[in-house]
Every structure is written in C-alpha cells, then in structure tokens.
C-alpha cells in the first residue's frame, strides 16, 4: 500500500480501483482493444486469402511478399510504415496504427492457414466438385469448415500480436 516500491507495507487492491478511475488508462485500454480486434479481424480475412493463394497457386514471389513482415525487425517495419504514411500524406492516428497492425499480422495468419491447408485431404474438395458444386460452393461448404481451426488460431495469434506489439505502433 506504499507509494514506494522498496517499502512493503501490506497487500491492497486500492491501486486497481484508482486505475479504473484514470481516464487516460481507460482510453488507452479501449484504443488497444479497438486496434487489436479490428486489425485481427481484417488480417484474418486477408491472411486466410493469402494462405489459400500460397497453397493453391505456386507463385514464387507471393510467399516473400506475405511473409516479409515476419522476417523484418519490428523497429524497421515501424519506421518504414511511418515513412510510407508520411509520403502518402496519410494522417498519423488510429487508422494508420490499425493499417500497420494489419500489415504486420497478415503473414502470421497466412502461415497458420497454409499449414492447415497442407494437412487437409484435397480429395474432399475434389469430391464436392465432382458432385456438381461450383468452386465457390466447394470452398464454402468443404474447405472453409476444414480449415476453420487454422483460421481461428490465426485470428487469435493476430489479436495477441496486435495487443502485444507496441513497436509497430
């Protein structure tokens, strides 16, 4: 209960009460959740598409483009995105932070989804196509439910990374 770390006076929860009455801390927590949820949702959609494209089409440059944010150090990516936003006259704020987090998280989602697709039995999708399903219907009714654990895992990973990653911000 002491204001000094070096002096132990006793156990108290009073500081947590003060934390929840601090407007700046509540606003920071709200912004963090907003950024995390938005970035992970958008990164999950685009990361799933990227993972599917990397699995389905063997384009040499695609994995390099999608997975580059994973290999680049966070500080370098943060500075690069800052320069990018300034050059394009994009105002620095919540939108630019969300875009940065999306760019950072897409690669992680793509890796998880691609690995889930690699473990999937392709004959199930082929059977759906043989039975008259369109490519979209086969994807929606067969492939997507089978890769859903990977999509959810990618979304959770993206949310965790977004909440954790202060350097990109």
Regions found by a protein language model. Name each.
Residues 27-35, 84-108, 148-150, 155:
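Loop-to-helix entry region at the N-terminal start of transmembrane alpha-helices
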């Amino acid at each position: 209960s002491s204001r000094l770390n070096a002096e132990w006076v006793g156990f108290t929860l009073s500081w947590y009460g003060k934390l929840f009455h601090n407007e700046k801390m509540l606003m920071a927590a709200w912004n963090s959740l907003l950024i995390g949820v938005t970035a992970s949702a958008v990164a999950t959609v685009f990361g799933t598409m990227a993972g599917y494209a990397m699995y389905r089409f063997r384009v040499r440059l695609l994995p390099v483009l999608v997975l580059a944010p994973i290999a680049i150090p966070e500080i370098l990516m943060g500075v690069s995105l800052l320069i990018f936003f300034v050059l394009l006259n994009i105002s620095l704020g919540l939108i630019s932070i969300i875009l940065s987090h999306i760019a950072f998280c897409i690669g992680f989602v793509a890796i998880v989804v691609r690995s889930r697709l690699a473990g999937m039995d392709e004959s199930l999708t082929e059977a759906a196509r043989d039975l008259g399903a369109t490519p979209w219907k086969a994807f929606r009714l067969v492939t997507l439910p089978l890769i859903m654990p990977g999509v959810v895992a990618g979304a959770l990973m993206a949310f965790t990374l977004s909440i954790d990653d202060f350097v990109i911000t």
